[in-house]
């Protein structure tokens, strides 16, 4: 017996567009000498004392296992010949605006997820084109013809599947998932590929012996709800290709944060500071990637006994700089103290964004 009704609207036409290695692609476009070389957007560890994280990198760098949020030091160790570029985020914002202008030629139902990806509902569109695949091809053509950049696109009847589809053929790919194919495609995927299923949920699913979409299909609804609460029903629906989440035109990101849970409690100050610095770097990279600056820094600490404290401080100016965020977080952890209790979780968030 189903606890919640399974309602699936198959009439919608949703496109997910994801720019390919966006920041790095812009740099290669503007400096042709970089073509074919591994390019990393992030601080050069040879100039920053080994500090910094990778904001993004091109596909040549990804061939070495480099990815976003990796430390610049590790990226250099994997690929010493890589070219590090600190990044011009104002330029990236302007190109992102140009990409969004292209989207709006076809529909005003656009939900930006970040500077380089968005969902489009083209069920009803400005050009009266009945084929979502044709619209996706036109968008890819416009982006290449006008901006000399490539984008991957996924087309399906909901956002979840459109996102899955856009990840299936990169770069410059276009994948369509039809209703009759959805369950079979999802069944073949590892649960890590399910958008919205985080690392902790994946670990818990693995503990249940659930590794693929097919494994998830075989788990009764009540078992998932007992284990994951309301999110268990979402998992039950995802495995069946069901999602009715609308494209939210007014979506506004209000904060940017990262947190990490530790299986072994942290007791030493140097270990805590090392983790906090890493979190600050990742938050700053996320802010820059999304073109955001904030002025309120929030530190979250959860102890071994599961008690949780948060501390915040507001700056006079808006920032997206690692050094500024780190300075405030160091002050906040000093104010909180009590490291000797053992720390189970640390989190850093920047909010109160510049409008």
From Swiss-Prot:
The gene is dinB. The active site is at residue 117. Belongs to the DNA polymerase type-Y family. Disulfide bonds: none annotated. This is DNA polymerase IV. It catalyses: DNA(n) + a 2'-deoxyribonucleoside 5'-triphosphate = DNA(n+1) + diphosphate. GO terms for cellular component: cytosol. It comes from Streptococcus suis (strain 98HAH33). Its EC number is 2.7.7.7. Pfam families: IMS, IMS_C, IMS_HHH. InterPro entries: DNA/RNA_pol_sf, DNA_pol_Y-fam_lit_finger_sf, DNA_pol_Y-fam_little_finger, DNA_polymerase-Y, DNApol_IV, PolY_HhH_motif, Rev_trsase/Diguanyl_cyclase, UmuC. Keywords: Cytoplasm, DNA damage, DNA repair, DNA replication, DNA-binding, DNA-directed DNA polymerase, Magnesium, Metal-binding, Mutator protein, Nucleotidyltransferase, Transferase. Binds 2 magnesium ions per subunit. Its cofactor is Mg(2+). It is found in: Cytoplasm. GO terms for biological process: DNA-templated DNA replication; error-prone translesion synthesis; SOS response.
């Amino acid at each position: 017996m189903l606890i919640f009704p399974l309602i699936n609207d198959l009439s919608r036409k949703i496109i997910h567009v994801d720019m390919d290695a966006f920041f790095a692609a812009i740099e290669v476009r503007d400096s042709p000498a970089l073509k074919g070389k591994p390019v990393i957007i992030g601080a050069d560890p040879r100039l920053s004392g080994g500090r910094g994280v990778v904001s993004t990198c091109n596909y040549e760098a990804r061939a070495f296992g480099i990815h976003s949020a990796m430390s610049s030091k590790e990226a250099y160790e994997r690929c010493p010949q890589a070219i590090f570029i600190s990044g011009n985020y104002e330029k990236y914002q302007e190109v992102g605006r140009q990409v969004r202008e292209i989207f709006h030629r076809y529909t005003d139902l656009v939900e930006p997820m970040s500077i380089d990806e968005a969902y489009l509902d083209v069920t009803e569109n400005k050009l009266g084109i009945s084929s979502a695949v044709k619209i996706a091809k036109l968008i890819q053509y416009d982006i290449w013809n006008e901006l000399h950049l490539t984008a991957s696109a996924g087309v399906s009847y909901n956002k979840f599947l459109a996102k899955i589809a856009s990840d299936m053929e990169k770069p410059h790919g276009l994948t369509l998932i039809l209703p009759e194919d959805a369950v079979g495609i999802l069944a073949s995927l590892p649960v890590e590929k399910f958008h919205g299923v985080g690392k902790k949920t994946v670990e818990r699913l693995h503990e249940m012996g659930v590794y693929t979409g097919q494994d998830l299909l075989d788990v009764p609804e009540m078992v998932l709800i007992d284990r994951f609460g309301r999110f268990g029903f979402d998992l039950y629906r995802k495995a069946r290709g069901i999602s009715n989440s609308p494209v939210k035109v007014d979506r506004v990101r209000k904060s940017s944060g990262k947190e990490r849970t530790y299986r072994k409690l942290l007791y030493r100050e140097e270990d805590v500071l090392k983790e906090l610095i890493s979190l600050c770097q990742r938050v700053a990279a996320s802010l820059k990637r999304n073109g955001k600056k904030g002025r309120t820094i929030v530190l979250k600490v959860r102890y071994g006994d599961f008690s949780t404290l948060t501390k915040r401080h507001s700056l006079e100016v808006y920032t997206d700089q690692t050094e500024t965020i780190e300075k405030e977080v160091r002050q906040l952890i000093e104010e909180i103290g009590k490291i000797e209790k053992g720390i189970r979780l640390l989190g850093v968030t920047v909010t109160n964004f510049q409008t």
